[in-house]
Amino acid sequence: MCENHVQQLVAIDFLVVPTVSFRLLFVFVVLGHHRRHAIHFNVTAHPTAEWTGRDIAEAFPWDSAPCYLLHDRDSIYGAAFRQRVGEMGIREVLTAPRSPWQNPYAERFIGSLRRECLDHIVVFNEASLRHILKAYVEYYEHSRTHLALEKDAPKSRAIQPRETGIVVELPQVGGLHHRYERRAA
């Protein structure tokens, strides 16, 4: 039953990442609206509607599919994709043509990913991009604060008490970002 829409709404989108050899890789992102949770990502050089359909099924195994799927009108979401989504019992919510602001959480995630990570790293190939994305999503999920989540991360963190002890720096995303924790002396 789909009663609370925000907990059952998922946004998807693609972003293009050039490699050092100017080859284009496409990143498929699935983002939950409730706590801006990055549910799934995958990388391919040749996205098709069939591939995207298989990937959405991979993102939601068994009976974990959301009620609503928000996406743009890109041709990549063709008949094979729509059929797979329908078989999973998901209702599609389409944005208006040329209206990226109607998919704000996915667009914001992609913008943050670019500004905070991809603009500072050279991508060599698909394997290196997967490695980079895995590290960034780990950082995004567990360490990066979000004002809309009251400065918490999508995966909620315990607040450390102010006690005597040294503050240690924990590098993340290959040293691009850092997390700080108190450790007992």
Whereabouts are the PLM-identified features?
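Charged DNA-binding/catalytic regions of mobile-element recombinases
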Residues: 1-185
